[in-house]
Amino acid sequence: MRAVVQRISEGKVVVDDAVTGAIKKGLLVFLGVTKEDTMEDVQYMAEKIVNLRIFEDQEEKMNLSVKDVGGKILAVSQFTLLGDCRKGRRPSFTEAARPETADKLYEAFIEQCEKLDIKVEKGVFQAHMMVHLVNDGPVTMLIDSKKVF
């Protein structure tokens, strides 16, 4: 499971001119599910992201989590995070999970974050989405449950 996590001051997802999810201060999480992912990966990613200390404390040191600052998560499924661009010019998505599996694990990630007392808004799985955000910092982190990087 792979995520791009951005600290944002606000963000929203729009599908067919309707807002499907919107937050103020928090994290925008683009989540890609691999064909090898399990509930263990879901658990790892949810706990890592909810407790990731990338918000500044009073001394302007990154020392607070989204939970600590009372923020929310805006979760967006994005299979293109699994694109392999090492060969040729067209990405290969062979490592991405099948849609039915990816949807199940994406929803499980959201549920796990909510079990950790974080409010989660979301995009629409497999929809063409317009994602609007104001990146705070900017602060952007890459997280992989297999610890590839």
Swiss-Prot record:
This is D-aminoacyl-tRNA deacylase. A Gly-cisPro motif from one monomer fits into the active site of the other monomer to allow specific chiral rejection of L-amino acids. One of its GO terms (molecular function) is D-tyrosyl-tRNA(Tyr) deacylase activity. NCBIfam families: D-aminoacyl-tRNA deacylase. HAMAP family: Deacylase_Dtd. It comes from the Bacteria. One of its GO terms (cellular component) is cytoplasm. Its EC number is 3.1.1.96. Belongs to the DTD family. An aminoacyl-tRNA editing enzyme that deacylates mischarged D-aminoacyl-tRNAs. Also deacylates mischarged glycyl-tRNA(Ala), protecting cells against glycine mischarging by AlaRS. Acts via tRNA-based rather than protein-based catalysis; rejects L-amino acids rather than detecting D-amino acids in the active site. By recycling D-aminoacyl-tRNA to D-amino acids and free tRNA molecules, this enzyme counteracts the toxicity associated with the formation of D-aminoacyl-tRNA entities in vivo and helps enforce protein L-homochirality. Keywords: Cytoplasm, Hydrolase, RNA-binding, tRNA-binding. InterPro entries: Daa-tRNA_deacyls_DTD, DTD-like_sf. It comes from Alkaliphilus oremlandii (strain OhILAs) (Clostridium oremlandii (strain OhILAs)). It is found in: Cytoplasm. A motif (Gly-cisPro motif, important for rejection of L-amino acids) lies at residues 137-138. The keyword Cytoplasm applies. Its main location: cytoplasm. Homodimer. It catalyses: glycyl-tRNA(Ala) + H2O = tRNA(Ala) + glycine + H(+); a D-aminoacyl-tRNA + H2O = a tRNA + a D-alpha-amino acid + H(+).
